[in-house]
């Protein structure tokens, strides 16, 4: 509905794009069942972690790498909440120490539009940000074609299908509960992105 997601916002399995997100959702449902039976559970939900040590890299990290390589000719109008991975680690420990049993906490910082993120990356890297905004409806079939091409050639896909699917939802959150109750650090997204860019550069990703 365009509002901010909170710990109480209902979500469904159908909204989860890809096996990774679906598996996390299903695992959380099982944990919630155990919580109702008395298991002392505190749940944390990180937004979009970025920073050092992103070896695979994650979908968000791959987006940064593709930008650094100048392979981001266009963008989709969507939103994300970037959080420093070190703050996420701290948030897990703080949840263990201070979290209330049976509660969940969104670990995040500032809500940004994707264009804002690319503007920050452009300043950090000197790479021109994409100037063309494309509708998700156009990108989605291209992502499927790109995935099929990847299966045939073995070349990793350039258009992340799961990311395009998730772009349907503006991933903006109200993170005040974790700030208020846990005291999670709030490293600015600009700093988190700078750490990610430096790490990817130093380790030969871009």
Role assignments for model-derived ranges:
Residues 1-3, 54-58, 119, 143-146:
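Short aromatic-enriched loop/helix-cap "lid" or pocket-rim segments at secondary-structure transitions
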Residues 1-43, 48, 72:
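Catalytic helix-loop patch of NAD(P)-dependent Rossmann-fold dehydrogenases
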Residues 3-8, 59-63, 148-151:
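Short, hinge-like loop/turn segments at secondary-structure boundaries
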Residues 91-158, 175, 180, 190-206:
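Mid/C-terminal beta-alpha module of Rossmann-like enzyme folds, strongest
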Residues 22, 26-27, 59, 76-96, ...:
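Substrate-positioning beta->alpha
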């Amino acid at each position: 509905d365009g509002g901010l997601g909170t710990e109480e916002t209902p979500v469904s399995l159908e909204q989860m794009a890809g096996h990774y997100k679906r598996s996390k959702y299903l695992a959380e449902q099982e944990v919630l069942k155990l919580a109702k039976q008395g298991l002392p559970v505190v749940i944390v939900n990180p937004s979009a972690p970025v920073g050092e040590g992103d070896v695979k890299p994650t979908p968000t990290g791959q987006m940064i790498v593709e930008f650094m390589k100048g392979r981001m000719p266009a963008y989709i109008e969507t939103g994300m909440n970037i959080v420093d991975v070190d703050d996420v680690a701290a948030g897990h420990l703080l949840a263990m120490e201070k979290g209330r049993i049976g509660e969940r906490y969104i670990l995040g910082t500032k809500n940004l539009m994707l264009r804002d993120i690319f503007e920050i990356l452009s300043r950090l890297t000197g790479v021109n940000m994409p100037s063309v905004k494309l509708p998700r409806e156009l990108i989605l079939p291209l992502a499927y074609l790109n995935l099929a091409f990847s299966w045939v050639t073995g070349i990793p896909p350039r258009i992340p299908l799961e990311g395009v699917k998730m772009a349907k939802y503006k991933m903006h959150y109200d993170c005040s509960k974790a700030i208020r109750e846990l005291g999670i650090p709030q490293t600015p997204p600009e700093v988190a992105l700078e750490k990610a860019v430096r790490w990817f550069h130093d380790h030969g990703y871009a």
